[in-house]
A protein has these predicted regions:
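A short helix-loop-beta-strand connector motif used in the catalytic cores of GNAT acetyltransferases and
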Residues: 10-17, 92
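Conserved beta-strand in the GNAT
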Residues: 24-32, 40
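A short, internal acetyl-CoA/4′-phosphopantetheine-binding micro-motif in the GNAT/acyltransferase core
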Residues: 44-51
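Conserved acetyl-CoA-binding loop-helix of GNAT-fold acetyltransferases
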Residues: 52-65
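Conserved GNAT acetyl-CoA-binding A-motif
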Residues: 64-79
Length: 100
């Protein structure tokens, strides 16, 4: 059995990323921009077959890298993305911390 190749690309509207494996859509993450310095990750979904292949984590990484490049902080409304932001310190630099 050949190794499957998963690729990640940004949606044409720039508001999310999708994952493809051999031409098949296997996952996506969506977000909205808030002002000039924040973005909200609102949804991450991965087909069941690919949930253990780190597709969701890699989609979160794609969004975080975009946030870094655009000098934005990320608010995680999606439970999966929030869990990844809590679990992996690599996201600390783009995590939005609300202060009063």
């Amino acid at each position: 059995m050949a190794q499957e190749t998963i690729t990640y690309d940004i949606f044409p509207n720039g508001l999310g990323f999708y994952a493809n494996c051999d031409g098949q859509h296997v996952g996506e993450i969506t977000f909205v921009r808030v002002g000039i310095d924040k973005m909200i990750i609102d949804r991450t979904s991965v087909t069941e077959k690919y949930q253990r292949a780190h597709v969701g984590l890699n989609l979160v990484r794609c969004a975080a890298n975009l946030a870094r490049n655009q000098h934005r902080k990320v608010i995680t409304m999606c439970p999966f993305a929030a869990a990844m932001f809590s679990r992996y310190p690599e996201f600390d630099d783009v995590r939005f911390l609300h202060t009063r």
